Amino acid sequence: MDKKTARMRRARKSRGRIRDVGAYRLSVHRTPRHIYAQVQQPDGATTLAAASTVEPALRQRSEGTGNVSAAQEVGRLIAERAKAAGIEQVAFDRGGYQYHGRVQALAEAAREAGLKF
């Protein structure tokens, strides 16, 4: 089993558990250059809030897009947008990635900005 297949298998298991709980899902996707976050409905059909380092406003504020400080900015921004959409409580879907580095920085920044998970 290659690295991507193993990550997708881990992600599928956690997404199934989140779907059973019926909570809004804060999902994270990362690439070497960018990090993306979105809040989805429990069934995964609709995205209610999204933020990423691809956005021009975030690109100008941070020194790079593939680092921990950029992930923290995305975490703060996704929390603000989720709260504006009326969402306070979410389940964190790390997408099969380790809870370390940029994924951890995004999660902690979202918690500090008032999102509960």
Curated annotation (Swiss-Prot):
Keywords from the named record: Ribonucleoprotein, Ribosomal protein, RNA-binding, rRNA-binding
Top-rank taxon, per record: Bacteria
Keyword Ribosomal protein among record annotations: yes
One CC-aspect GO term: cytosolic large ribosomal subunit
Keyword RNA-binding attributed: yes
Biological process according to GO: translation
Alphabetized GO MF terms: 5S rRNA binding; structural constituent of ribosome
Function: This is one of the proteins that bind and probably mediate the attachment of the 5S RNA into the large ribosomal subunit, where it forms part of the central protuberance.
Subunit and interaction comment: Part of the 50S ribosomal subunit; part of the 5S rRNA/L5/L18/L25 subcomplex. Contacts the 5S and 23S rRNAs.
Recorded family membership: Belongs to the universal ribosomal protein uL18 family.
The name this protein goes by in its record: Large ribosomal subunit protein uL18
Lineage, opening ranks: Bacteria, Pseudomonadati, Pseudomonadota, Gammaproteobacteria, Chromatiales
